């Protein structure tokens, strides 16, 4: 039974930010998108995130030693990939222009790190002239549903196209 802190409905999604039960964590809170957990964070130092965000951060920062790199994140969620991570440049693309303000005010409780572009992920990778060292694909409309236009061969070709020659593509 959740005690909802904030509920926001936009033209694209329903967002809920509220406390969650995670033993051993300081003030843990969740960011739900369409009733599915999109992001987790707490006030520990360093903060705890969802397992997959911890894993992505470990791959990019520890295993690949990314520093001073350009990272594209398709699907913003709670903006936790770049949270308190100053060593790289992040660009988030999300179809909902309201997600950043909601995440900053109610979930992160601080400014999100990185550039935010309100656009459809497929259109962005199809038309962008920019190139990135990594593309992280994290686009869900619910816990088990990826928008169908983001699982096409053309989408993946365009996601690859915006990579620099030695770039990596990571998908959740």
Question: What does each model-identified segment do?
Answer:
Residues 126-139:
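A short acidic, Gly/Pro-enriched loop at the edge of an enzyme's catalytic core
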Residues 110-121:
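Conserved SAM-binding strand-loop segment of SAM-dependent methyltransferases
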Residues 1-108:
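Class I S-adenosylmethionine
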Residues 151-165:
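A short glycine-rich, Lys/Arg-flanked "PGG" loop and its adjoining helix->strand segment in the class I
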Residues 94-97, 119-121, 151:
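Short beta->alpha hinge that forms the Motif I/post-I loop of the SAM-binding pocket
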Residues 166-172:
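Conserved beta-strand signature within the Rossmann-like core of class I S-adenosyl-L-methionine
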Residues 143-150:
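Glycine/threonine-rich flexible loop motifs
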Residues 123-129, 144, 161:
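Short conserved loop adjoining the S-adenosyl-L-methionine
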